[in-house]
């Protein structure tokens, strides 16, 4: 029997990796071994950063809410506590959006929180 070297399968595998490495800088999109390493790292970064993105956005929202709350004479923690006492359930994403795009509505929420805090 003739020896089968698996050329078609190997070429397909290498081609798939090099296609995934398209756009990478330098040898990382040309050489199979370095491309494979970079693609593996890319999968790791993508997995890690999908989780990191959630933390980053929460941080951003809290920063925006804090800035708007301080313009209304409250700290972030006081505002959140006041809203909880007033039984106003608005998540941080919506609060941050109000702080940026609708200052009047945010001020109304801040006033409701102040009233419950007794300020």
UniProtKB/Swiss-Prot annotation:
Cite the entry's keywords alphabetically. Answer: Ribonucleoprotein, Ribosomal protein, RNA-binding, rRNA-binding
- Molecular function per GO: rRNA binding; structural constituent of ribosome
Q: Which domain of life is it from?
A: Bacteria
Query: What PROSITE patterns does the annotation carry?
Result: RIBOSOMAL_L20
Instruction: Tell me a GO biological process for this protein.
Output: translation
Q: Name one GO cellular component term.
A: ribosome
Which residues are in coiled coils? none
Q: Which family does it belong to?
A: Belongs to the bacterial ribosomal protein bL20 family.
| NCBIfam families (UniProt xref) | rplT_bact
Record function comment: Binds directly to 23S ribosomal RNA and is necessary for the in vitro assembly process of the 50S ribosomal subunit. It is not involved in the protein synthesizing functions of that subunit.
Q: What is this protein identified as?
A: Large ribosomal subunit protein bL20
Q: What organism is recorded for this protein? A: Streptococcus equi subsp. zooepidemicus (strain MGCS10565)
């Amino acid at each position: 029997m003739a020896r089968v070297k698996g050329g078609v399968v190997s070429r397909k595998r290498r081609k798939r990796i090099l296609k995934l490495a398209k756009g990478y800088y330098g040898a990382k999109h040309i050489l199979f071994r370095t491309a494979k390493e970079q693609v593996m790292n890319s999968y790791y970064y993508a997995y890690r950063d999908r989780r990191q993105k959630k933390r980053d956005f929460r941080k951003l929202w809290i920063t925006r809410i804090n800035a708007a709350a301080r313009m209304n004479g409250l700290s972030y923690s006081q505002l959140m506590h006041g809203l909880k006492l007033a039984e106003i359930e608005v998540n941080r994403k919506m609060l941050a959006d109000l702080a940026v795009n609708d200052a009047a509505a945010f001020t109304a929420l801040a006033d409701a929180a102040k009233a419950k805090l007794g300020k």
